[in-house]
Amino acid sequence: HLKRGGHPAQVEDGYSSTWYRAQYQHAIMPLISIIISPSNHTLNAEKTINSILKKTAYPNYEIILIENKNMEKKETKLYKQIAQGNRIDTVKWEGSSNYSSANNKAVEQTKGEVLLFLDDAIQVINQDWLEEMLQFVLRSDVGAVGAKLYYPDDTIQHGGLILGIDNLVRYSHKHFPKNSTGYFGQLVLAHNISALPASCLMVRKQVFQEVGGFNKNYSLAFGDIDLSLKILEKKYLNVWTPYAKLYHHKSKKRDHKTITKKENRFAKEKAYFEQQWADFLEKGDPYYNPNLTLDREDFSIALK
């Protein structure tokens, strides 16, 4: 099957004797540009960067730090100190708080063929995390790749995103135990998915530019989902892999509902997203079983 599809790969045992995994083989080791943007739930950028530098086996990467005008002076000083490293550079964002626009500007400064958008509250777990994501994103039919993120208490933060849950979008398998295999093995098997969060999102620069990058109208939320759906529109696949593992030091209580109470922008961007992607949302998430509940992220049967 892999040979017919033109995907050189080695097949290995997976999580169990009945599940297998394909290790896709590529002759190139492209430069990966890791773009880190500041957020409100960070430990600090220094810990994230140290984690990358100490625990990443893949040698060919650069780090781009987005420095916005609202950062505290001590944070700005920290960024400048970090930027003295050979791998690390900064890009200043002087505009208003806009995640999409800031990251689009950062992309302009990157030298890599592959982009990795990363929150500054991330801690690397396995040394080959970049290789695990890269093997998928280098496939010509793949647009973006997401990783397996854990909360600090070792419960699952997400296995990708599901559209339609709670009339919006929610994390797949949120709060599941660390060692859970998930719904039909989804937490231990690489699989296609509709959308991926930008907390750890890898995409080829060519694909990112082809779809127009992040939509600046999504300054606070939905920019990553919009990007994912634009990638699907171009007939690329979005892939989630359980073999790239990271901790995300993000509060369990912080989600779209809590943001709504604090930010009027969220309601406007939500309405814009629902209008822009009305046809897709009406049809339902193609990677989610229509017999399952849309009330929770636990893959339980829908009670009609």
Descriptions of predicted regions:
Residues 115:
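Short aromatic/hydrophobic "clamp" motif used to bind/position activated sugar donors
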Residues 67-78, 95, 123:
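A conserved acidic beta->alpha catalytic loop
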Residues 1-32, 153, 165-192, 238, ...:
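C-terminal, non-catalytic tails of nucleotide-sugar-dependent glycosyltransferases
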Residues 122-168:
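Conserved donor NDP-sugar-binding/catalytic core segment of glycosyltransferases
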Residues 1, 129-133, 187-188, 192-212, ...:
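A short, conserved alpha-helix in the catalytic core of glycosyltransferases
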Residues 31-35, 62, 226:
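Cell-envelope/extracellular polymer assembly enzymes that use nucleotide-activated donors
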Residues 50-60:
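Short, acidic, metal-binding catalytic loop of nucleotide-sugar glycosyltransferases
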Residues 93-110:
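Glycine-rich, basic loop-to-helix element that forms the pyrophosphate-binding segment
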